């Protein structure tokens, strides 16, 4: 038997004598720590996946993990022009190999421009400043910046 949304206290445990208690506190997005990351044109990928309203036509997705890949694919399928910015040397390094290849192929097929080895240094209202894989500073004009740089577990209950 699984019970969700239950307030658990000593009385509850004594009464029901569960074999196990699983505490699922959820997670919060990790926020990018660069100038401009709190701008109005910056959105969190998990929010965009729930509702893409307010996302412009030209989008930079920062991060190429599972959430970033899903977001890039979803936005490209909506006809958005998507650039994926990844500071690691390869796209999708954090994704299981069995899933990485089909996701990367899907992004290629949808026209997502993938920029591995590229580090975001600043976000402005007009786009993002990066250091590209060759070490050169570059400005990438976009309407919207979507951050997908990871999730941190909520531990307030511990």
Whereabouts are the PLM-identified features?
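Helical element adjacent to the flavin cofactor pocket in flavoenzyme catalytic cores
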Residues: 1-2, 103-112
């Amino acid at each position: 038997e699984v019970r969700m949304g239950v307030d658990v206290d000593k009385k509850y445990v004594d009464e029901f004598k569960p074999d196990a208690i699983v505490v699922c506190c959820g997670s919060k997005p990790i926020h990018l720590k660069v100038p401009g990351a709190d701008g109005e044109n910056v959105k969190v990928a998990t929010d965009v996946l729930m509702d893409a309203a307010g996302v412009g036509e030209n989008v930079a997705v920062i991060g190429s993990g599972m959430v970033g890949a899903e977001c890039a694919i979803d936005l490209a399928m909506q006809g958005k022009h998507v650039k994926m910015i990844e500071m690691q040397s390869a796209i999708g390094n954090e994704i299981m190999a069995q899933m990485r290849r089909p996701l990367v192929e899907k992004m290629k097929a949808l026209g997502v421009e993938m920029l591995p080895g590229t580090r975001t240094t600043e976000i402005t209202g007009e786009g993002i400043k990066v250091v590209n894989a060759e070490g050169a500073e570059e400005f990438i004009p976009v309407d919207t910046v979507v951050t997908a740089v990871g999730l941190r577990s909520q531990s307030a209950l511990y």
